[in-house]
């Protein structure tokens, strides 16, 4: 079953975020002591306000896949236009549930919502391994946006 998350899901989403982060290692990196508190605050308030919409797929009563979309309202213009931009992030499916089409159905739910909500575009920074997956679900490479990175950002 695919549905939008509620604040009741936040603790499980935090656990999945931790799993997702450490799946590809980060051995030796310092753990944030405030992770759960910070995650819970940001995601709970985001869900309540509508700034973040989170889709989850469940199997046997547990969340097995999710995708987060943060919305950015556009400044109005005096012509007809779409109202928002969506930042798609934290897309994850538990390893034991991959290859079953679950993540694709979650992405399809996200893009259906975007169409219905008049979102102008969804942007995502895919890994090399996930690029083909996004392309199969309607995402296209439009070139890199210009970005400013904090001087201390490891990226």
Where are these regions (language model features)?
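Conserved GNAT acetyl-CoA-binding A-motif
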Residues: 107, 114-126
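Conserved GNAT-fold acetyl-CoA-binding loop/helix
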Residues: 21-42, 52
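Conserved acetyl-CoA pyrophosphate-binding loop and the N-cap/start of the following alpha-helix
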Residues: 97, 101-109
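Conserved acetyl-CoA-binding loop of GNAT-fold acetyltransferases
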Residues: 119, 135-145
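A short beta-loop-alpha structural element at the N-terminal edge
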Residues: 1-15
């Amino acid at each position: 079953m695919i549905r939008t998350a509620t604040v009741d899901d936040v603790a499980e989403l935090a656990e999945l975020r931790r799993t997702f982060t450490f799946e590809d290692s980060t051995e030796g990196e310092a753990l944030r002591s405030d992770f759960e508190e910070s995650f819970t605050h940001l995601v709970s308030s985001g869900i309540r306000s509508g700034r973040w919409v989170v889709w989850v797929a469940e199997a046997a009563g547990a969340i097995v896949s999710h995708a987060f979309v943060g919305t950015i309202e556009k400044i109005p213009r005096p012509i007809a236009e779409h109202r928002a931009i969506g930042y798609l992030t934290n897309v994850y499916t538990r390893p034991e549930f991959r290859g079953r089409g679950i993540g694709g159905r979650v992405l399809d739910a996200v893009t259906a919502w975007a169409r219905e909500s008049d979102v102008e575009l969804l942007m995502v920074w895919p890994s090399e391994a996930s690029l083909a997956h996004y392309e199969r679900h309607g995402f296209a490479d439009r070139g890199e946006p210009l970005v400013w990175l904090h001087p201390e950002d490891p990226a």
